[in-house]
Amino acid sequence: MEYQYPLDYDWSNEEMITVVKFYEAIERANEKGIVKEELMDLYRKFKQIVPSKAEEKKIDKEFQEVSGYSIYRTIQKGKDTEEHKIVKM
């Protein structure tokens, strides 16, 4: 899909790459499916960059507006999925 990911230009290039990989994982979970461990590992890395719940909610809202996918619902599904299984929305 072609849309602009929500990014904070105060993030370093490495942090932006990490966040974009996380967004791509959310897309995969919603489109094809992704192994739980991969999704949750990328979420942990995302949370190191965005530790604030308020900022995470803001980013989720912006991401959902451009992609149609909810970070929150996808991560909740990931948490509820058994180990080594595919997370698919």
From Swiss-Prot:
* InterPro entries, per the entry: BH2638-like_sf, UPF0223
SUPFAM superfamilies referenced in this protein's UniProt entry, alphabetically: BH2638-like (SSF158504)
The lineage is: Bacteria, Bacillati, Bacillota, Bacilli, Bacillales
Which species does this protein come from?
A: Bacillus cytotoxicus (strain DSM 22905 / CIP 110041 / 391-98 / NVH 391-98)
Pfam families listed in its UniProt record? UPF0223
Q: Which family does the UniProt entry place this protein in?
A: Belongs to the UPF0223 family.
- Protein name from the UniProt record: UPF0223 protein Bcer98_2663
